[in-house]
């Protein structure tokens, strides 16, 4: 026969009250996503990044955006071009990751676009422990290799985030050898746009 043990009221209420919640800082586990599915809220609260749903509010900082793609990055890869620009300034998430791998390695992953070559140390920065091209280098690479619309948008984005014309031209000057493809077009775009003084 079960024995009744008297319990103080405050102990019972403390047991039933909600425990402190830990914020979601990354990809939610599948079991949590199945419970939380609500079509009208998903579009407002979650962003699809390379097939993983990420909480939208964690993507407001460069560190949060880097954390969102860190699991998909290969070891010692350096983020380049549109992916690096997205990490720095935000906007629509990338469909693929552009990276430079040491030793010219290639990847078979469908979402990974690899480039050969090394970036000069002055054209890289570290965000959240991962090496990434600077805003200036990312914009210059898009201006060299992207479509005309992407090229102009990248330079305008860099300008709007405080990168000067001189900085962009100096960064463009670092593009040597095979990395010099598209330099005349990028230089023309940089010199054609009005910059803040």
Predicted regions and their residues:
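Short gly/ser-rich loop at a beta-strand->alpha-helix junction or flexible surface loop bordering the NTP-binding
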Residues: 1-197
């Amino acid at each position: 026969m079960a024995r009744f043990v008297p319990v103080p009221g405050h102990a019972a209420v403390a047991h039933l009250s909600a425990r402190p919640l830990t914020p979601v800082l990354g990809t939610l586990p599948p079991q949590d996503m199945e419970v939380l599915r609500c079509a009208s809220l998903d579009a407002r609260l979650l962003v699809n990044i390379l097939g993983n749903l990420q909480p939208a509010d964690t993507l407001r900082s460069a560190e949060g955006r880097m954390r969102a793609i860190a699991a998909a990055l290969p070891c010692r890869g350096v983020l380049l071009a549109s992916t690096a620009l997205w990490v720095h300034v935000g906007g629509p998430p990338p469909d693929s990751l552009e990276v430079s791998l040491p030793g010219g390695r290639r990847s078979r992953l469908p979402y990974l676009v690899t480039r050969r070559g090394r970036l000069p140390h002055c054209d890289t920065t570290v965000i959240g422990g991962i090496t990434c091209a600077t805003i200036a280098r990312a914009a210059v690479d898009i201006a060299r290799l992207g479509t005309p619309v992407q090229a102009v948008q990248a330079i305008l984005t860099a300008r709007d985030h405080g990168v000067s014309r001189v900085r962009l031209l100096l960064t463009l000057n670092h593009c040597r050898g095979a990395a010099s493809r598209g330099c005349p077009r990028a230089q023309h775009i940089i010199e054609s746009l009005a910059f803040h003084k």
